[in-house]
Amino acid sequence: MAFRYNTPDPELSIKLENPRHLSSGHLPRYIPGETIIGVVRRTTPGAVPEARVVVTLHGKCTSKIKIKRGNSESRYESSFNCLSAPMEPEILFSNAPLHIPQGEGMSWPFAVTIPSVVEDVRRADQRKHYTLPGGSTFPPPGSFAMYSESIWTTGEQVRASVEYYVQARIELSHVHRGITKKAIHTAKAPFQLRNVNIGPPITDFRLKRHQMTHMIAAYKLVPGMGDLTFGQKTRQTFMTTSVPRLTFKLNVILPHTLQIENESPIPIYLSAEPVTGSTTEIIHDVPQTIVIKSFMLRLKQQTLVQAEKHSSVTSEAVNLIPNTAIGALGREVSLTVMPRTSGQSEEPARVNLGEMLDFRMRKHGLQPTFKTYNVGRTYNLAWEVEGRVVGEKFKLGYTHQAKVLPGPSPYNEPDFERPAPRPEALPEYLELSEAPPAYSA
């Protein structure tokens, strides 16, 4: 199916024959290594003694930072070629007479291939402010666009983009009164470049465990405790040593790698284990219920934009699991801990919260983690648990770095070999994070 990307122009127009993912109002998408097939057409009648028609693949990543300070304004810009050295033009018609009769037209088919990898294009003077995106070679970045404005704080406006297009150019030469004159017309066909992760959707989300310790001080931890006296309430408020204490470790096992357009279920495990040595002896061998009231998972994206010696970081958050999700289940989610007087505590039972909440990477309009010379996108995954033990509230939370992979390559693509799926890592091999909590209440 053909799709026209520029307004039809009798002087010159482009028609791409093989775009994928066509939808109204959206540019077509290609992937690195793919060949773009199309046709350049001219319908303006006439004859010239010499003409030349070429097409060239273009890619550029640009950044612009504008800063207002009172009545003054500073602008900083940068632009890099995303496709290594300038791509060699494909010559479709060269240095020959061109005659187009009235009511007809002339077409030239073309095929240009998007590079699978590109090389460093920084000049020596640019290496001070702009870092290399990858190793000696790296994939071209996917299409990207962002705009940020913070008038009420720094008066800063930031724009960044990664853009690709095919450009056609026709040069018409003729001699007038002994002087060779040249008329030039161009046409552009923009498209989106979509990076892919070779193979089927991932099943290994790099699960890791975060372990956080919390203490509850309450008389209600003792079975059969009735209404509290005024003195007990006072001692509990000030958490005196006479108030029974339960100390437990909350284990949260969750992904450190996510993938766009991968709707496979993602596990999130919760478990709790007692810390007997820090628990009041009177409640040893007494099971305690930890009721999980809410769980929130948020993906925080940061975009770094560099323009000359100036840089800007903008942040935005996307809710993957809202804090109302557990309440919407209509049933209680709980964990049980029981400090043992003697012997080792039993292996704590796990709750697969991801399965309960049907957690999947649905479409959130996300970009994968990426870095170019002047633009980069990184992610942090923040979680928060709210719970109760014998009516006493607590809140725990943590933030860790996460990587968002591009979507999987299409299975029906003959150019891609499907590797065997990797099994999910077993819990006993998960890494333990002993870092202090971001907050605890």
What positions do the PLM features span?
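Eukaryotic beta-rich interaction modules
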Residues: 15-23, 32-39, 246-252, 273-282, ...
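Short amphipathic, basic-aromatic surface patches that mediate peripheral association
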Residues: 41-46, 118-122, 272-288, 305
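General structural concept
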Residues: 3-146, 387, 396
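Internal, hydrophobic beta-strand segments that form the core of beta-sheet-rich folds
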Residues: 40, 56-61, 110-115, 125-175, ...
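Contiguous beta-strand segments within globular domains
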Residues: 28-41, 258-274
